[in-house]
């Protein structure tokens, strides 16, 4: 590259224009962040119980695990992604928004996970889109297991 040439910025994925004509600024989905109390415990849960792969970790504050195209960012106390909000509210584990993971043979998965001692939020639900059930990670963060209708 010549000294007068500038390196071009990465190109964003094509996005729909807003009404004002500007392009979107979102480049891509990075991942989903869950607040956790114990990063090591959460890594063990996601890798051993659900088959995630450990990408990297900086204990005790942070780890990233993945499965397929999903990156799950686990932020423990002290991580930059866990700091209090401007109004003082603490980011805490739990809630109702959740990661939805597709599975095959949901009843068999439920049976195996119950034998492993996982916590369930509900019984299996069946609807027009498929079957689902919610489990919790060790910090109470919800995870939905979903089997699409055939």
Predicted features, each with a name:
Residues 34:
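Mature N-terminal segment immediately following signal peptide/propeptide cleavage
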Residues 42, 46-47, 113, 140:
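Conserved active-site tyrosine of GNAT-family acetyltransferases
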